[in-house]
Structures are given as structure tokens and as C-alpha cells.
């Protein structure tokens, strides 16, 4: 069907940009202005994600690497950016207009030629496209010391296979070793050519409900990461696959809705790391009751466009383990696995279908390094790749009894890489293997081992099945949504009730606190009143005692005064006896008055100093004792 005639589809996603690019670092000039900077997903170049219409700033000259092509030059002459413009790096359009038209027509032809039938669960079941296993070889551009290698297409081969041949001459004979694969890409090949011939059918099958896996295998520095991620001008397999997947979703003519989620992890020194979540907790490999191998906890994020995928991958690549090696300035030191989950919902049949695409960038095998950390990393990398080779060899032998390889125990658990790829390698996913090689003479052994690995992978078992549709998921989801809304209303009601009760409780607590304060204050007042009453009672007793004492003292004073008066009278009488009667008579009146005055003066209270008062008290006391 034509894309122009298809009706709008409710995908549940933001409409993706067509044929957008995956963000990467392109080859650029070195600081000296010559040479080239190898591609690196972690190179700290700034990018502008918000504006894709600004053309890239370039120099007018065309440069090549004067020191020979690097692992990521791939024999292509690049237009390099002029110095000082890296911080203004923006992304240009991915394809020329003619390529856009070609891709659109190609997709329309695929839609019109692929037969479909509706299964019992309401899903349209597309015929499987391509073969179960696709093996491809990519030759890195030659630096120097080229070995004796050749490649080409087999003539009259019904499968359209291609060969790569090594010819070794000795003094007595010529030895020729030939390997056959689905595709052999020469040094002049482009990333899009590789994607179109080796990966595109896998992506289409994923859209149709099958699982697929694409992984790059090869020696360090042969262009695995370049092939998988690409550069700004030449996007790799991952961005091209995401572009195609979103394009298929956008042009789908059914009423199905789609969701695309991705996870991204790395295996470094046999430790799994969630690159998206980037938490301290190490994810663990778990196997459920149905035999499915999963990683938990692992972050899966919803993406709505290729641009979002680009940004997520770029942020993850910035923290991925890389280091300089003898072959490459930026070399991946870990296996990276990007998993894409396509969730397809049929609202009519109330079914859902989940298919997955795994994009694996394996760390490169290498010889032992003198650097301690690189040597340790290399040991883990080589061990996992050796286990992968053993697993593939024994799976191939089990699937093809005619092979002489050992088909004994399959050591999936000896490496976390093979444990994660267990289901895919055992035939449940369509496999596309891209083996990258270098045909330089000093890499002959590594190249031969890589070709043997890819040859064995062609014999892996195939039991590819379409993902099952889960029935009534949509209806159950609608029911759950309804229950969720009801629960939300109840939660809102109870939340308001709790708020009101909380307010009432606070008011009650305030009132109780006030009563407690009043009670505490009343208790204090009562205690003070009792204390005052006790003190008052004590004072009353003291006052009564003082009054009694005062009364006693007054009686003593009266007695003393009376005694003094009696003494004065006695003295006066004695005086009268001594003087003549005449004088006595003459002075009677005056003497009486004087005695009266003297008595009056004695009755007056004298205010004396303390010591005199004490002396007087003592004399009074003595006199009182005498009187008594």
C-alpha cells in the first residue's frame, strides 16, 4: 500500500522525525590540523540537539589522514570541520533527497509485497522475511602490510553467498582458505549498505512480532562500534534501525497502537551495569518459571522518536567504559547491549504483543597488554568471547550432527554475556552477525579466528517463532484504569477526610494542651495557697506566743515599778526621820510633789541602746527573782 494512502495511526507516541540521525562523533581534525580523530561515543564534544536545520560548519578543503587510515576512517575521505568549530557542532540531514525517496519507495514495496493473514487472536501475521541467521563480514581499510586476501560473490550460487579467500604461498605449494558468508563488505562499503543487506530484514521481522539480535564481533580496532553507532555523517546500524522502526510505526495502516521502550546495559569485567539507571545496585540475572532470562533491576525508558533514543544512548555512552589501546584511541572495554522492546496493542481484539530487538556491541578481543588495568580488562573480555565461541560451536554441533565439533554441555553460565544471550543463541531470535576484520598481515591469526567464529555461527539452531499475543490485556487494562479512577476518587475522598480529621485532632490536642496548662496552673495555685495557709498558721502561733510573752513582760514591768515605788517611799520616810520636824513640815508639799514627779518619770518608757537595754533586762530579771 502507498504511504500516502494510509490513514493516520494512533500510535500512542509522538510522531517521530523521519530518517533522523544517531548522535555520534565524526572524524575531525587533530589539534595540529592534520590527521584524524577516531570516532568515540564518549569524546567530550558538545552538541546541539534542539536545532537540526543549521548546516554543519566545515572547512573548504578535503583532508585525509596522512598517517594512514585509522580503524574508523574505512577508506572514506571526510570533509573535516575547521579548527575552533567543534563547540558549534550540529547535526545535518542524514540522507540526500534522492535517498529519502528511495527509502520511502522501498518501504512501500515491502508493504505491498509482504503477504499478511489475520490470526485467531486478531493480529496480522506477516510472513517471515529473510533467513534465520545472517552472517556478514566487514573489512577494515588497509593501513599497510596487506595480507593476501580476496573476496567476491559466488557465481551461480542459489543463496547469493559471498566468499573471502586467503592465499598463502610456500616454497612448495600454495594454500588457499575460503570462507562463505551471506555478505562480505569491502573497504569501500558504507554503514547504510551494511544495514540494508544484513539488518533491515531483522528490524522488519521485529515489527512483525519476531525477536531479533544483531551483534558486532571482531578484534579491537576493526570498526565494531563504528558500524553499530556510526558518525554524524554516516550513522550506523543502531540509528538506522531505530529510524526504520519508528517509520514502520508511523506508516502502519492498522488501528494498532505502539509503545517503544529501551534498556541499555554494559558488562565490564563480568559485572553488569545499568547505563540508563546508573545506580549503585548491580543488576542480577534471573530466570523465571518459563525459562526466560531477565536482568533485574534494569531501567526501561519509553521513547517516542529516534532523537530521544539518540540522546539516551549518548548520555549512556558518556559513562561507558572506554580506554586507549594499541589499536584505537577510544576503545570499548565492555560489552554493550541495547534492547528495544516494541509493544503492539490491538484495541479491537484486546491483545498485546511484545517483540524485542537486541543490538550488541561486543568488546574486541586483543592480545595481552603490558598495562595492568588493560591486561585485567582484556582477560575478562577474552574469557567471555571464548565462552561465546564455545557456546556457538556446541550449539552448531548439536543442530548439525554431521559436524565433528563437540556437542556436549553448553556453558551458558560461564559468562554473563552468554547467559544474557542464551535465548537468542538457542534459536528463538533471528540473528545477524557482523564480523569485522583487518586483512593486514600482522593480524592474520586474529582475522582467521574471527572468520572461523562467523562460520560456526551460521550453523546455529533456528526455532524462530512469532511472539505470542496476550489476550484481554487491553480490556483488563481498561478495567484496571476504571478501577484506578475509582480508587483515585476514593483516595481523594479519604485524603480530604484524613485532612479534616487531622485538623480536628490538632484542635483537640490544642484544647487538651490548654486544659493541661490550666490544670498545671491550678495545681500550682493550690499548692501556693496551702503553703500560705501553713505560713499564716505558723505566724498566728508566733503572734500568740509573742502576745503571751508581752503580757508576761508587762506584768514583770508592773511588779518592778511597784517595787521601785515601795523602795522610794521607804527611802523618803527615812529622810523625814533624819530632819527636824519643822523642815519636814515646810517641805512636805514640795517633797510630795518631787516624789510624785519622780514616780511619774520612772513610769515613762526609756529608749536606751541595745547593750543598756540588755543590762536593764538582766537587772529586772534579778529583781523579779528576788521578788518571787
UniProtKB/Swiss-Prot annotation:
Family matches, as InterPro entries: Kinesin-like_fam, Kinesin_motor_CS, Kinesin_motor_dom, Kinesin_motor_dom_sf, P-loop_NTPase
GO cellular component labels: cell cortex of cell tip; cell tip; cortical microtubule plus-end; cytoplasm; cytoplasmic microtubule; cytoplasmic microtubule plus-end; microtubule end
Residue ranges annotated for the Kinesin motor domain, each copy included: 132-460
Keyword Transport among UniProt keywords: no
Listed Gene3D superfamilies: Kinesin motor domain
Residues annotated to bind ATP: 218-225
Ranges of biased composition (kind: Polar residues): 589-602
Highest taxon in the source lineage: Eukaryota
Broad class of the protein's primary localization: cytoplasm
Sequence segments annotated as region (Disordered): 588-628
Record field: compositional bias (Basic and acidic residues): 603-620
Function: Promotes microtubule growth, possibly through interactions with the microtubule end, and is important for establishing and maintaining polarized growth along the long axis of the cell. Acts as a kinesin motor protein that moves along microtubules and is required for proper localization of tea1 and tip1 to the cell tips and microtubules, respectively. ATPase activity stimulated via interaction with mal3.
Entry similarity comment: Belongs to the TRAFAC class myosin-kinesin ATPase superfamily. Kinesin family.
Assembly description: Interacts with mal3 and tip1.
Name of the protein in its database record: Kinesin-like protein tea2
Organism field: Schizosaccharomyces pombe (strain 972 / ATCC 24843)
Gene name in the database record: tea2
Amino acid at each position: 500500500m502507498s504511504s500516502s494512502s494510509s490513514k493516520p495511526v494512533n500510535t500512542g507516541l509522538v510522531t517521530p522525525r523521519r530518517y533522523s540521525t544517531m548522535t555520534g562523533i565524526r572524524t575531525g581534525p587533530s589539534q595540529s590540523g592534520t590527521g584524524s580523530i577516531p570516532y568515540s561515543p564518549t569524546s567530550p564534544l558538545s552538541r546541539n540537539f534542539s536545532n537540526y536545520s543549521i548546516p554543519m560548519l566545515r572547512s573548504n578543503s578535503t583532508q585525509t589522514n596522512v598517517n594512514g587510515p585509522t580503524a574508523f576512517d574505512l577508506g572514506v575521505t571526510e570533509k573535516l570541520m575547521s579548527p575552533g568549530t567543534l563547540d558549534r557542532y550540529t547535526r545535518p540531514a542524514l540522507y540526500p533527497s534522492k535517498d529519502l525517496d528511495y527509502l520511502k519507495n522501498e518501504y512501500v514495496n515491502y508493504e505491498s509485497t509482504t503477504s499478511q493473514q489475520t490470526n485467531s487472536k486478531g493480529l496480522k501475521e506477516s510472513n517471515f522475511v529473510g533467513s534465520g541467521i545472517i552472517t556478514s563480514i566487514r573489512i577494515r581499510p588497509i593501513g599497510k602490510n596487506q595480507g593476501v586476501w580476496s573476496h567476491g560473490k559466488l557465481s551461480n550460487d542459489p543463496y547469493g553467498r559471498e566468499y573471502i579467500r586467503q592465499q598463502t604461498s610456500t616454497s612448495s605449494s600454495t594454500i588457499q582458505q575460503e570462507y562463505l558468508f551471506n555478505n562480505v563488505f569491502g573497504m569501500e562499503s558504507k554503514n547504510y549498505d551494511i544495514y540494508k543487506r544484513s539488518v533491515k530484514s531483522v528490524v522488519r521481522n521485529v515489527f512483525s512480532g519476531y525477536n531479533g539480535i544483531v551483534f558486532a564481533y571482531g578484534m579491537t580496532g576493526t570498526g565494531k562500534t563504528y558500524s553499530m553507532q556510526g558518525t554524524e555523517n554516516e550513522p550506523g546500524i543502531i540509528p538506522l534501525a531505530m529510524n526504520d522502526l519508528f517509520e514502520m510505526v508511523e506508516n502502519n495502516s492498522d488501528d494498532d497502537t505502539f509503545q517503544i521502550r529501551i534498556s541499555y546495559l554494559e558488562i565490564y569485567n563480568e559485572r553488569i551495569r545499568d547505563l540508563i539507571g546508573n545506580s549503585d545496585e548491580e543488576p542480577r540475572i534471573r530466570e523465571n518459571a518459563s525459562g526466560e532470562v531477565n536482568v533485574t533491576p534494569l531501567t526501561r525508558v519509553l521513547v517516542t522518536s529516534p532523537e530521544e533514543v539518540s540522546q539516551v544512548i549518548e548520555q549512556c555512552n558518556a559513562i561507558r567504559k572506554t580506554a586507549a589501546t594499541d589499536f584505537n584511541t577510544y576503545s570499548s572495554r565492555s560489552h554493550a547491549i541495547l534492547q528495544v522492546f516494541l509493544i503492539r496493542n490491538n484495541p479491537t481484539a484486546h491483545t498485546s504483543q511484545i517483540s524485542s530487538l537486541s543490538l550488541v556491541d561486543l568488546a574486541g578481543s586483543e592480545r595481552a597488554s603490558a598495562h595492568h588495568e588493560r591486561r585485567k580488562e582484556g582477560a575478562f573480555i577474552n574469557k567471555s568471547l571464548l565462552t561465546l565461541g564455545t557456546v556457538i560451536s556446541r550449539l552448531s554441533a548439536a543442530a548439525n550432527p554431521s559436524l565433528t565439533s563437540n556437542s556436549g554441555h553448553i556453558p551458558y553460565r560461564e559468562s554473563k554475556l552468554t547467559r544474557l544471550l542464551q535465548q537468542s543463541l538457542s534459536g528463538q531470535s533471528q540473528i545477524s552477525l557482523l564480523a569485522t576484520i583487518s586483512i593486514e598481515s600482522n593480524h592474520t591469526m586474529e582475522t582467521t579466528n574471527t572468520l572461523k567464529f562467523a562460520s560456526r555461527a551460521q550453523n546455529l539452531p533456528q526455532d524462530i517463532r512469532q511472539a505470542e499475543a496476550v489476550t484481554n490485556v487491553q480490556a483488563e487494562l481498561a478495567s484496571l484504569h476504571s478501577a484506578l479512577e475509582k480508587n483515585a476518587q476514593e483516595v481523594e475522598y479519604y485524603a480530604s477526610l484524613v485532612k479534616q480529621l487531622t485538623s480536628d485532632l490538632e484542635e483537640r490536642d490544642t484544647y487538651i494542651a490548654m486544659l493541661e496548662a490550666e490544670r498545671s496552673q491550678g495545681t500550682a495555685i493550690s499548692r501556693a495557697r496551702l503553703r500560705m495557709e501553713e505560713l499564716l498558721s505558723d505566724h498566728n502561733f508566733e503572734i500568740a506566743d509573742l502576745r503571751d510573752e508581752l503580757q508576761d513582760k508587762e506584768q514583770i514591768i508592773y511588779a518592778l515599778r511597784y517595787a521601785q515605788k515601795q523602795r522610794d517611799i521607804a527611802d523618803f520616810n527615812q529622810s523625814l526621820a533624819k530632819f527636824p520636824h519643822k523642815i519636814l513640815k515646810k517641805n512636805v508639799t514640795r517633797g510630795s510633789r518631787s516624789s510624785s514627779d519622780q514616780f511619774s518619770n520612772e513610769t515613762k518608757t526609756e529608749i536606751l541602746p541595745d547593750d543598756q537595754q540588755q543590762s536593764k533586762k538582766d537587772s529586772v530579771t534579778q529583781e523579779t527573782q528576788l521578788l518571787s
